Amino acid sequence: MGVFRFISISLAAVSAANAAQILSMPHAQTVPHSYIVMMKDDTSDDDFNHHQSWLQSTHTHNITRRATIQNAGMRHKYNFRKMKGYSGIFDEETIKDIAKDPKVMFVEPDTIISVNGKVEQSNVPSWGLARISNSQPGANSYVYDSSAGEGITVYSVDTGVDINHEDFEGRAIWGSNQVNDGDDRDGSGHGTHTSGTMVGKEFGIAKKAKLVAVKVLGNDGSGPTSGIVAGINWCVEHARQNGGTDKAVMNMSLGGSSSSALNRAAAQAVEQGMFLSVAAGNENQDARSSSPASEPSVCTVGSSAEDDSRSSFSNWGPALDLFAPGSNIISARPGGGSQSMSGTSMAAPHVAGLAAYLMALEGISGGAVCDRLKELGSSSITDVGPGTPTNVLISNGGAKGGNPKPAPGPSPNPSQPSEPQQPAPSQPGEPGESFPGEPFPGEPFPGEPFPGESSPGESAPAPAPMPPSPQHPHTPYPGGDNFDFDGYWKKYFGGEHWRKMFGSFWN
């Protein structure tokens, strides 16, 4: 009896020692009882299936304990070939049981990610398109090769897209909705704006690329990390089955507190051949405190102003790869027409659009695209911020291909854009392929982007010091002297907001 008791205690000690880490997010806004579980890299499909069967059995056994938790159980399942995991609603004891499985790498509380607060300004001249194709600021024409991203698919992981907007010319399709709100539209306007910059006929860079809308943020611009990871997984699988990940670009104008799960998902997408453009954030602080901007394998983008200075709101630091226009950018809005927004959310789609353009023109893909963007860019940005290793502003100049001709920039009136006047066809470069296949049926998604800056002409605030801990909430990157912080936090983090958005999680 004593021997049996000794063995039992020893096994319990070994189990406890090998238990996966349950990560703490003390400063983050978490979704009640919601967790993300990541399996170890060597987990086979059989191991994963066995774990899921065990989890179902555990839920059945703990049914009385979970009676007070609504909608308990698995919600998303992730399978990136080399990375497997899932998310769900679980009670504390079940989470402890999950962590004891030797195949589990870590368990992470599900946190909220949001779009960055938006800054809208009327009658602002458009300048971003012209800047990336001219050597000096102040130009008013966009010069590009007529291949214009043809054959490349761009995935907008955002608040959704008005796919019927005239600027998309029928090249945009609905893909997936990870928000589970049953609302396949862009109620925020953020996703339509970023998509217009990427592929729009008038406002866009890659004017012949296809667009797939993947909604991971709700109409209020926020959503849990678990849904964003699911959105990334969906994009990778869709690209693999529809033309290949080497002809796919993903834009993520969103961010929040540091998340191992989100960074690992982004890294898996890059490893499997996709190009990811990610907004650095709008807090005027070190971008290493945010995910997915802190993931080294993605292309992390800071924002520049019209005078080639770093935008006053833009994050900085070692995580940044490039800068792109992000202040007072005019692009499409839901329902037709246009509007002006500012933020690193506006800078990232310039990089995503130019990536699609270069992939079609030069036949490059994946991680090579960010390196090529650095080669083509100009060393123009001033006041890059502490520890920032680059002052490169993106440019399409010098890209090999056909003979580019200038095209007029977008209309300066954001409410009533004029009919776009495209240049006469130039000698084409490397032609791309037609859009490969049909999208998967839609489903909901969560996540969020980055907001405003101070008015033009104001001096930029001194950079904020590096936060002592990377564990703060996945929230938008607000910024700007006129930004209503009190109203923002009350709106997005007040109890009533979350009760309405995640009502099923509350008793």
From Swiss-Prot:
Compositional bias annotation for Pro residues: 405-428, 438-449, 462-476
Record's subcellular location: Secreted
Domain Inhibitor I9, residue spans: 34-113
Cleaved signal peptide residues: 1-19
Protein EC: 3.4.21.-
InterPro entries the UniProt entry points to: PCSK9_ProteinaseK-like, Peptidase_S8/S53_dom, Peptidase_S8/S53_dom_sf, Peptidase_S8_Ser-AS, Peptidase_S8_subtilisin-like, Peptidase_S8_subtilisin-rel, S8pro/Inhibitor_I9, S8pro/Inhibitor_I9_sf
GO biological process: proteolysis
Main location: secreted
Entry-listed glycosylation sites: N251
Polar residues: compositionally biased ranges: 282-294, 378-394
Superkingdom of the source species: Eukaryota
UniProt-recorded Gene Ontology molecular function terms: serine-type endopeptidase activity
Active-site residues from the entry: D158 (charge relay system), H190 (charge relay system), S345 (charge relay system)
Start and end residues of each Peptidase S8 domain: 126-400
Parts of the chain that traverse the membrane: none
Gene Ontology CC annotation, any one: extracellular region
Pro-piece positions: 20-116
Keywords: Glycoprotein, Hydrolase, Protease, Secreted, Serine protease, Signal, Virulence, Zymogen
Ranges of Low complexity composition bias in the record: 450-461
Positions of region (Disordered): 175-198, 282-312, 378-486
PROSITE patterns attached to this UniProt entry: SUBTILASE (PS51892), SUBTILASE_SER (PS00138)
Similarity comment: Belongs to the peptidase S8 family.
Function: Secreted subtilisin-like serine protease with keratinolytic activity that contributes to pathogenicity.
PANTHER family given in the database record: ALKALINE PROTEASE 1-RELATED (PTHR43806:SF58), PEPTIDASE S8 (PTHR43806)
Protein name (record): Subtilisin-like protease 1
